[in-house]
């Protein structure tokens, strides 16, 4: 096994980013690679555009799972790569290409080196939306190979290569999409008194929504309401009949999520009355928090500090990031950690270029951890 192989795999995958539950080329690429591995100890199942691979251990006491995401993002790539995306308007801007290369590296390692416990590798589609974790967990394929513990990583542009970060307990927030549609009465710009202007109504609602965090959420708690898109109107001299707001809600507690949604609904009702319009609210896709099981995470962090001279561990703070891996952790003990890839551009940026040296770091670290974990009672 050579690390350059998995760098090339990452580059191949980088060229074929696909939307959630449409990762057809990605799935086929992964299956083609899996077929080249020694088949004696592995079983392969497909689920929609995802893949489950079970690898038999020598004396299994448990089933240890590793999960990677697969999908790309609707972003026009602006990197300097010679291996830029071949799918116009889509890009691997969140590191899922690296995540998959690392997963294949781990799987390959354990086809060449024995391990006591059984391993399960989950190639999960649709992390960016509409969410693949929960339906995968509900599948018959997953039920037959339900793991005893589960782990994952995510690239982190802000950390240097060779550095990882995590913490016990809450790591990522609860998230919910937010879509609000307002419908009033359009008309000629010269006669505003004969129309109900949804540009004004939508703008008013945006400012009202910003009061939720400052005036309704405990200052010692954390929450975010962001409106990322406001769309209204057709021409400069036409009063807009419709307005659409698109945004996101993020909280660390489910209580705060419920409170934020309640306040949104109250404010929207106020806009309906105040601007004589009709409104609908859609919360779209929502993910539960990523909660790292305390004991497993603490033991992992201690193991890294004591056994891994080539990796630096940082105890990080919670982040408002959303990740549907949280659904796995809601029912199965495990954790997620950040993997340093040192790049000036952040996640979901069109110019992000993660340092590929991190692939080798991750494969080496996790393979050693799994070997150690499988030796524990």
From Swiss-Prot:
EC number: 3.5.1.47
Catalysed reactions, as listed in the record: N-acetyl-(2S,6S)-2,6-diaminopimelate + H2O = (2S,6S)-2,6-diaminopimelate + acetate
Keywords in alphabetical order: Amino-acid biosynthesis, Diaminopimelate biosynthesis, Hydrolase, Lysine biosynthesis
Enzyme class: hydrolase
Pfam families tied to this protein: M20_dimer, Peptidase_M20
Coiled-coil positions: none
Pathway annotation from the record: Amino-acid biosynthesis; L-lysine biosynthesis via DAP pathway; LL-2,6-diaminopimelate from (S)-tetrahydrodipicolinate (acetylase route): step 3/3
The keyword Nucleotidyltransferase appears for this protein: no
GO biological process, one term: lysine biosynthetic process via diaminopimelate
UniProt-annotated catalytic positions: 69, 128 (proton acceptor)
A GO molecular function held by the record: N-acetyldiaminopimelate deacetylase activity
UniProt cross-references to PANTHER family, sorted A to Z: N-ACETYLDIAMINOPIMELATE DEACETYLASE, PEPTIDASE M20 FAMILY MEMBER
Biological role stated in the UniProt entry: Catalyzes the conversion of N-acetyl-diaminopimelate to diaminopimelate and acetate.
UniProt protein name: N-acetyldiaminopimelate deacetylase
Highest classification ranks of the organism: Bacteria, Bacillati, Bacillota, Bacilli, Bacillales
